[in-house]
Design a protein with these regions (language model features):
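Hydrophobic anchor residue at the start of the ABC signature
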Residues: 55
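Catalytic Walker B motif of ABC-type/P-loop ATPase nucleotide-binding domains
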Residues: 66-69
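Helix N-cap at the start of a conserved alpha-helix in ABC-type nucleotide-binding domains
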Residues: 77-79
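Signature (C-motif/LSGGQ) region and adjacent switch/coupling loops
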Residues: 2, 38-41
């Protein structure tokens, strides 16, 4: 898990010291609730834990936006809801734009703006703000 989250920091345009990487990864593990899993292999994690690792990895280099393609697609309803709550809280806290693709209307309803598509064209736009 640790190395999985560290990878984007090693290849980022900005150079991070070992101390900076340690601080960033420790904070991300805490924010996604995986402090106790830092030495685990992804194969030993549940689907929800793997998604949380992916979120932490995406946040490692402080992006302006996160793009998610079906972030809850392989998860049960309860875990999917938890993942969406985590995503929304993290992007709100860090001021990051979240763009996601989903076929789940319940997940779409958690977003501020929804674009419905059919045949590659936007057929409807809804905005809650």
């Amino acid at each position: 898990v640790w190395e999985n989250i560290e990878l984007p920091l090693l290849y980022a345009k900005k150079s991070f010291t070992a101390k900076q990487r340690h601080e960033i990864i420790t904070g991300l593990l805490k924010s996604v609730g995986l402090e106790s899993k830092e030495n685990d292999y992804p194969i030993n994690l549940s689907g929800g834990e793997q998604q949380r690792v992916a979120i932490a990895r995406a946040l490692a280099v402080s992006p302006e936006a996160i793009l998610c393609d079906e972030p809850t697609g392989a998860l049960d309803k309860k875990t999917g809801t938890q993942i969406m709550e985590l995503l929304h809280s993290v992007v709100k806290e860090k001021g990051i734009m979240l763009l996601l693709v989903t076929h789940d209307p319940d997940i779409a309803d958690t977003c501020d703006t929804i674009f419905e598509m059919d045949g590659g064209r936007i057929t409807c736009a809804k905005n809650d703000t």
